[in-house]
């Protein structure tokens, strides 16, 4: 076939051949926003093809299906190339960009195999991936207007999962809980104070609900936050709270003051939950095992030396037993640690 372009004014321009040539003609050739070709057609991943022009690119791959080759503006390309082009997590572009109206402002969105690129009204290009991209595009008009344009890129959370910041909120994703939306406001502010998903509430698991009177509720892995219409936030008791409340006065006295609290790491059995570290011990809680307490003795010291719940013993599943002679025993998912009355500590793992 004939090449789409052979010359660019006085200078010779590379020819655009094959599948990209038809798309180039369709958008208007050198008189379009693409301008003149800069490089001949080149091969991409898995049999794809691309051509570079003065102001953008044309990409083709069979994943585009009936859409055929698509254009990409230079600013989107420059952000995408930082993620390793079509070889990276986003894969190939599968649509031309199109306008998207949010809250009275207009930006643009372009689809990729595994996400989207969004150009904001301020001309920032943001990449959204996977479930977060799908959720954003699936929001109704009112919810999307409330959330706004993306204000950040796809980012990893402190515990396994991802989030994207928006002008007025955040979309979270985790393997266990899928996607959920929280908006800026009193509940978001309290969640931030508590350490977001790494704090004692864990991941957001349901969309924040905003009622007609302005009150709000958000459900997390390990608790619920509620805000009245005046913005006063209350927190329902977590599993750690309930476990601590069930302890005897003597046990509470032995634990003493709180040092720290938050979500645990994952155990070898896949268990995650909450912990509250006291001066004299730790209270744990998980959905699988409920609440359990362990005190600051040689038993806890050995457990700590192996990596706590993420180590070879796994999660604490029962309260540490304290016998009349001073000996102690703690049972974990994958073994037991004991201390005799003389303070000698031994650990045994299940086969």
Positions of PLM-derived features:
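Extended, compositionally biased repeat/scaffold regions that form elongated interaction surfaces
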Residues: 1-351
């Amino acid at each position: 076939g004939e090449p789409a372009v052979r010359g660019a004014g006085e200078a010779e321009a590379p020819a655009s051949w094959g599948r990209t040539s038809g798309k180039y003609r369709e958008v208007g050739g050198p008189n379009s926003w693409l301008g003149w070709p800069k490089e001949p057609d080149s091969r991409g991943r898995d049999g794809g093809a691309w051509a570079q022009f003065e102001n953008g690119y044309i990409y083709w791959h069979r994943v585009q299906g009936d859409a055929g080759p698509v254009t990409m503006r230079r600013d989107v390309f420059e952000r995408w190339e930082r993620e390793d082009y079509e070889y990276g997590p986003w894969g190939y572009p599968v649509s031309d960009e199109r306008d998207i109206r949010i809250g009275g402002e207009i930006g643009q969105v372009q689809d990729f195999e595994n996400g989207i690129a969004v150009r904001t009204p301020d001309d920032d290009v943001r990449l959204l991936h996977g479930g977060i991209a799908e959720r954003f595009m699936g929001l109704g008009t009112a919810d999307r207007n409330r959330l706004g344009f993306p204000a950040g890129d796809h980012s990893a959370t402190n515990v396994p999962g991802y989030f994207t910041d928006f002008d007025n909120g955040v979309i979270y994703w985790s393997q266990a809980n899928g996607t959920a939306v929280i908006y800026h406001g009193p509940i978001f502010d309290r969640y931030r104070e508590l350490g977001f998903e790494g704090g004692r509430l864990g991941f957001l698991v349901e969309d924040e609900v905003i009622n007609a009177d302005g009150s709000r509720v958000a459900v997390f892995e390990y608790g619920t936050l509620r805000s009245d219409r005046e913005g006063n936030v209350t927190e329902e008791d977590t599993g750690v709270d309930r476990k601590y409340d069930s302890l005897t006065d003597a046990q509470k006295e032995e634990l003493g003051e709180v040092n720290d609290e938050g979500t645990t790491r994952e155990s070898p059995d896949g268990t995650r939950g909450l912990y509250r570290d006291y001066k004299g011990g730790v209270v744990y809680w998980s959905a699988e095992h409920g609440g359990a307490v362990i005190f600051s003795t040689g038993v806890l010291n050995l457990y700590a030396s192996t990596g706590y719940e993420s180590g070879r013993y796994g999660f604490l599943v029962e309260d540490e037993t304290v016998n009349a002679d001073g000996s102690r025993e703690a049972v974990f998912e994958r073994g037991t640690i004991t201390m005799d009355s003389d303070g000698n500590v031994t650990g045994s793992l299940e086969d």
